[in-house]
Structure formats: structure tokens, C-alpha cells
């Protein structure tokens, strides 16, 4: 019998790196809402009292970047110096944006395929490799460790916003270790929550007593509600529960650590359970295959698992800048496939159009911000881009495609 423990982590929206992801995607939403053809590559940096946005944007949209950045930071919860040491109203906002390079633009605007098909004329915005993954460990076909870590992080933010625990501050991290037997989750080994908090908790000032109170409240208001509908639940007697292992977490957010866009790519995807091509998502418009092709790869993998063609699937795609069709497609079912991996790969090549233009069209990636009232990508920037049950994501809806694949068996 094979036994092992696998661990994944998540972070809350108030984590410095996640602030940056949300700022970058808020800029993307604003540009695409007014001009769906906008080319955006927006990076953000936060530090004590500072938010810088930089990168390349070519767009007809008129955006008040200063106002937008402050609104994002304020909505996260950094409304004053007492809300974690970072203040949306008084922090400096610096904007240093250029236009997209004409050399890159020509490859995206007119692919090298010399085809009359409009979808062949949208080239990949860069070279690169992307991975998509799905497995049958959860209803949303995600690995259990990252699914649980996101549940806890979302719940941690919710109880803060709703003041169910009134001493919590925006920065926080979760980590979940799951025990497996023969590749199947069998128990939750460890839950770790690090959460920023006020220096005084309901009149308690002794550090040891504060941490005991926080641990008690987090189990009651975060862990139990976040896992109540799961068949595999943490057990108070056997699941190790760690809270703020350093002893306290008062200094946090950008005051405690600098943040950068794109530094939580494993949190954004599969929690380390599957491979990653290295490209971040946030702040990138859909012509960047780092983002759009990773979404498509997830769609392919999830459809294959939903169609019961395999219990676990990883899909690799690769692209060349300025070329529409993928350079390569590879499917790995880890020995769980109903047919061989080569047959699954051929099936993907035959049944999925993975040109950037086709992906953008199928998921309506350029129009989603305006369709959703000016905000879409920003909502993907915290708590993962895959397996979401709280927001509607087109690459997660595989029901129709899974039916079509089932008929091909």
C-alpha cells in the first residue's frame, strides 16, 4: 500500500502578491470593458505606502489608474492605517506604462500561417508551454489539497469582511496537508492558517492567550463552515491545526512584505499537484497564451475527466510567437485512461480548437469584463483560476463538451 502526504497552500486577497494580481487584473478589466481589443501587460508592485503599476498597454480606453488602484486596495480592506498598516487613501500611486512593442503586435495581429481563416490570423502573443490538469478528487475536478486551501482562504476573508471575527486584518495564508493511500485522499493530516490580526483581541493582550483565542475562533468560524459539506472532513482529535506558528502576525500586508504581480502562480493553478509552464496570468489580455491557453488546457483536461475517459489528466500545450496553431499537444493520464495517452492526444487534436483566436472566441475572453459589468478578471486574481464554485468561469463549464466526448467512446 502506497501512503504519502501532499500539501498545497493558498493566500487571501490581502496578501501583498495578491494585491498586485488584483490591481493588474482590475486594469485589464477597465481596458477591455471600453476596448475589447486592448493589449495589456500590466504589472504591479506594492511596498510600505506605495503601489506602482508598470508594463505595456495599447488601448483606446480612458482609465483613471490612480482612482482604480485605490479602489481595489480599499475593497480588499486596507482603508486606513489601522486596517493592517496600508492605507488606500494615503499610499502613493505611481504609473509607468508604455505601449505594446510593435514587434510583438505584428506577430499577434497577423500570424505567419498565411491563411484566410480569421482565427488563423491571430498569432500567439509569445512562445511558451502551458499545462492544464483535472482529477476526480473533488466535484469540481480539482486536487483536494488546493481545493481545501482555497476554501479556507475564502472563508477567512469572508469572516473578516462580515466582522464575524472583528480583530482580523487583510493579510493571510492557508495550507492543507492531505494523506493519501494508493493515490486516494483518506484523511486531512494538517491545517495551517496564518492570519494577520490586531495587537489586542477583545481586551486580551498576552500573546499566548491571543493565539489560543484566534485558534478557537478560526476552527469555529473558518474551518468547520468551510468543510461542512465535504465527505472528508478535518477531525479535531486527529487533524493537526496550526495557527500563526511564529506567535503573532500583527505587521502584515505591504507593510510587512513587498508584493509583485505573478508571484503566486502555483496558488493560482493546482497547488503544485500538476506541472506549471511558468507563465503568470494576471494583468495579461487574452492574446497572451500564458493565460488563455492555460485556461484552454484546463478545459480540455476537465472535459476528458468529466467524460470518464480518465480519472486524472494533465495536458501540455506549446506555442510559438506569431503562430496560431499549437506547436505541440501532449496528454498524460498517469495510467488512469480508458484508452492510451496517444489516443487521448489524438482525440484532443481532433476535437479541440486550440488556436489563440479560437480560444478567445469560444470563451468570449475579450468581452467578459463588459458583459460582467466591468469586472471579471479581477475576480479570478485571488483564490484560484480553476475549480471555482463562487464565480462562473467559461473554461470550467465542460458539460456539453464532456457529452460530446462520451459519444465518441
From Swiss-Prot:
Annotated pathway: Amino-acid biosynthesis; S-adenosyl-L-methionine biosynthesis; S-adenosyl-L-methionine from L-methionine: step 1/1
Protein name: S-adenosylmethionine synthase
Species in which this protein is naturally found: Prochlorococcus marinus (strain NATL2A)
Catalytic activity: L-methionine + ATP + H2O = S-adenosyl-L-methionine + phosphate + diphosphate
Keyword Magnesium among record annotations: yes
Keywords of this entry: ATP-binding, Cytoplasm, Magnesium, Metal-binding, Nucleotide-binding, One-carbon metabolism, Potassium, Transferase
Positions annotated to bind L-methionine: 56, 100, 257, 288
InterPro entries named in the record: ADOMET_SYNTHASE_CS (IPR022631), S-AdoMet_synt_C (IPR022630), S-AdoMet_synt_central (IPR022629), S-AdoMet_synt_N (IPR022628), S-AdoMet_synthetase (IPR002133), S-AdoMet_synthetase_sfam (IPR022636)
Function: Catalyzes the formation of S-adenosylmethionine (AdoMet) from methionine and ATP. The overall synthetic reaction is composed of two sequential steps, AdoMet formation and the subsequent tripolyphosphate hydrolysis which occurs prior to release of AdoMet from the enzyme.
E.C. designation(s): 2.5.1.6
Subunit structure: Homotetramer; dimer of dimers.
Residues reported to bind Mg(2+): 17
Matches recorded under NCBIfam families: metK (TIGR01034)
Needed cofactors: Mg(2+); K(+)
Gene name linked to the record: metK
Amino acid at each position: 500500500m502506497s501512503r504519502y502526504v501532499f500539501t498545497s497552500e493558498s493566500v487571501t486577497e490581502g496578501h501583498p502578491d495578491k494585491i498586485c494580481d488584483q490591481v493588474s487584473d482590475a486594469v485589464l478589466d477597465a481596458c477591455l470593458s471600453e476596448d475589447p481589443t486592448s493589449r495589456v501587460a500590466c504589472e504591479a508592485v506594492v511596498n510600505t505606502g506605495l503601489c506602482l503599476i508598470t508594463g505595456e498597454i495599447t488601448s483606446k480606453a480612458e482609465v483613471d489608474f490612480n482612482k482604480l488602484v485605490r479602489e481595489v486596495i480599499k475593497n480588499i480592506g486596507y482603508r486606513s492605517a489601522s486596517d493592517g498598516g496600508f492605507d488606500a487613501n494615503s499610499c502613493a500611486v505611481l504609473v509607468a506604462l508604455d505601449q505594446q512593442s510593435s514587434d510583438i503586435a505584428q506577430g499577434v495581429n497577423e500570424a505567419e500561417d498565411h491563411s484566410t481563416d480569421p482565427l488563423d490570423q491571430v498569432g500567439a502573443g509569445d512562445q511558451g508551454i502551458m499545462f492544464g490538469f483535472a482529477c476526480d478528487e473533488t466535484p469540481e475536478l480539482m486536487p483536494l489539497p488546493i481545493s481545501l486551501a482555497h476554501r479556507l482562504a475564502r472563508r477567512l476573508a469572508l469572516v473578516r469582511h462580515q466582522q464575524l471575527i472583528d480583530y482580523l486584518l487583510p493579510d493571510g495564508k492557508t495550507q492543507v496537508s492531505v494523506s493519501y493511500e494508493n493515490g486516494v485522499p483518506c484523511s486531512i493530516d494538517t491545517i495551517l492558517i496564518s492570519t494577520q490580526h490586531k495587537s489586542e483581541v477583545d481586551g486580551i493582550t498576552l500573546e499566548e492567550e491571543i493565539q489560543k483565542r484566534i485558534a478557537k475562533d478560526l476552527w469555529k468560524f473558518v474551518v468547520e463552515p468551510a468543510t461542512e459539506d465535504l465527505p472528508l472532513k478535518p477531525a479535531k482529535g486527529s487533524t493537526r491545526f496550526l495557527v500563526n506558528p511564529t506567535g503573532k502576525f500583527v505587521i502584515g500586508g505591504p507593510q510587512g512584505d513587498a508584493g509583485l504581480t505573478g508571484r503566486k502562480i502555483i496558488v493560482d493553478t493546482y497547488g503544485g499537484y500538476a506541472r506549471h509552464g511558468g507563465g503568470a496570468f494576471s494583468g495579461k489580455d487574452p492574446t497572451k497564451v500564458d493565460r488563455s491557453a492555460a485556461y484552454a488546457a484546463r478545459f480540455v483536461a476537465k472535459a476528458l475527466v468529466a467524460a470518464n475517459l480518465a480519472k486524472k489528466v494533465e495536458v501540455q500545450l506549446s506555442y510559438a510567437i506569431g503562430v496560431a496553431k499549437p506547436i505541440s499537444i501532449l496528454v498524460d493520464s498517469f495510467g488512469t485512461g480508458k484508452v492510451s495517452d496517444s489516443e487521448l492526444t489524438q482525440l484532443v487534436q481532433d476535437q479541440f480548437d486550440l488556436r489563440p483566436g479560437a480560444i478567445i472566441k469560444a470563451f468570449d475572453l475579450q468581452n467578459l469584463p463588459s458583459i460582467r459589468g466591468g469586472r471579471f478578471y479581477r475576480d479570478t486574481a485571488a483564490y484560484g483560476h480553476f475549480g471555482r464554485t463562487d464565480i462562473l468561469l467559461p473554461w470550467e463549464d465542460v458539460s456539453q463538451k464532456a457529452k460530446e466526448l462520451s459519444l465518441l467512446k
